[in-house]
Structures are given as C-alpha cells and as structure tokens.
Amino acid sequence: MATLHKDFERLLTEVSEVGRLYDGVVFIGGIAVYLHAINHDATSAFAEATKDADFYISLSSLSDLREIEELTPNSRLSKHEFKRREFSFDVYAERQSRLPVPYDEVMAHAVEYDGVRVAALEDLLVLKLEAAVDRHASEHGRKDAKDVIRILLLGKGAAFDAHRAVAYMKPGHFERLGHIVDGAEFTAMAQGNAKLAKRMRQEAAEVFEKIARVYDPENGS
C-alpha cells in the first residue's frame, strides 16, 4: 500500500469505526473508490486519498447514529452531515435520499475490505456519474471524472456486470460517461505518460463499450 498522509490514515480509522458500529452502513463516493482501487494491483497506483467520507445507511441504523452523533440536515441535497473528530461525513438515508440507486440494491451487492462495506463497482459507477453530471464544470467534477475512470479500470479486471450497471443509469449519466472516456483526465492520472494514458483509455473504453451494448436510453428516467 502506498504511503498515506497521516490525516487520511486517521480518516480511514474513523471510517472503519463507523462501519463497525452500524450494521446498515455502506460507504459510497470517493472513499469507496479508494478502497476498491488500493486493494487491486492494477489500480493501486491510481488510488487517491479523500478528505471526507459519504455513506448510505438504513433507517434503523440512522436512528442509532442519531443517538451518538449530532446530525445536521441538508434538505437541499437530501442528506445529513456530521463531524467525527475533525472529519466530515455525509449521510444518505434509506428512502430519504435522492440517490439514483436504491439503498437495498447498494447494500445487497456491497463488498467488504477489512470489514468496511463499500458499494459494488456497478452501483458506485452510477452514483459517481450522478455527481459528475451535477459538478462537471468544477474541480470536484474533475475528481469525479477520475473516480469514474478508476471504476472503469477496476471493471476491466473484475467480473463487471454491465446489465446491473445500466439498471439505474439515466441518459445524462451515459452521456457524461462517454465524455469522460473521451476526455483528458487519463493524461493527468498518468502524470503525462502518453503510453500509459493510451493504455488506460483503451481499457476504460472496453468497459464503456460493454455498457453501451446493453444500455437502452428508452429505459432511462
């Protein structure tokens, strides 16, 4: 594992503790992409630390969380927020959030790394594309695009189910995915190594083509 900044090591400790305390938690967002990437040889070099953590939570575990943490509602984004030590956590509750993939689906297919549940690649792709659509013109949008690329690279080396990936994929998600695959972030991730960037793009494009073959825009909502 690459050397980590001490702040991020502490965040990972808090993530592990939250995951241990609440049965209904599954991590999403950048922290989930990191845990997938760092645990696979093909993508570990591209794993990127994050400053906060997002998770989906069941209603029963949300009640337990309220008893321990001081949650601040964010009705505009349909989530709750809290601080644990110095770190920010965004909480998306079952049947209360507007995330495109239902909680039950995400939890049913979640995978674990060292006891921490994270969304499967197929669900994480759609959740990340939702963020990428909303923030594509910002610096956050660039990070979203890189996370989408990491997911595609992971999908190249894993049993990626394209049919599951498109089940909740909207036309805007698919369009943004195409822009990302054709975009410039591969060069940035490869730190200017044109040969590596080309290989990464080819591998990501293979997974995109699998998705494109089964995606039906008529079923998009």
Regions found by a protein language model. Name each.
Residues 1-221:
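Compositionally biased terminal segments of proteins
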